[in-house]
Amino acid sequence: IHILCDAIRTPENIGMCFRVAESFGVEKIYLQENSPFDENRKVVKTARNTLHQIKCEFYGDFDEKLCILKELGYTIIGIEITDQSINIQDFNFTNHEKIVLLLGSERNGIKNTNFIDATIAIPMFGRNSSMNVIHSLAITLYEVTNQIGTENKRI
């Protein structure tokens, strides 16, 4: 599993992305080139020593990075509420060998859904219509590992 962060800017969210991803054995995280990273103390503090335990690659152009990942055979799955979103529990992750989970920015979500193979949504039962991007990532990674298993390997 790889994670592509689309313009996530909050240092705490970047740090928690690494912390949660490492907990589930994620192989690689892609960050936009101007994202805060190991020079930012809030990122370092929230990541809790996981920043260099996961491969990280910085990209410049979001659409170009999506196209490259698709050319490499990855299925791009956006974690986003759209009219076409599939309930996360109904999405079969086992049908996809190479997966990139796409996280949208805190304010605007995923800016371009044209290259996405699917969008998944997490059912919510309260009055709030959204949740923090990293909470969504944690729930999604739990569902992925629940479906595909891990057998103590990177996913």
Question: Over which residues does each language-model region extend?
Answer:
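Short glycine-/acidic-enriched loop or helix-start segments at secondary-structure transitions
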Residues: 14-15, 40-41, 87-89, 111-114, ...
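Structured adenosyl-cofactor binding patch, chiefly the S-adenosyl-L-methionine
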Residues: 113-155
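Short, glycine/charged-enriched secondary-structure capping and boundary segments
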Residues: 17-19, 43-46, 90-94, 115-117, ...
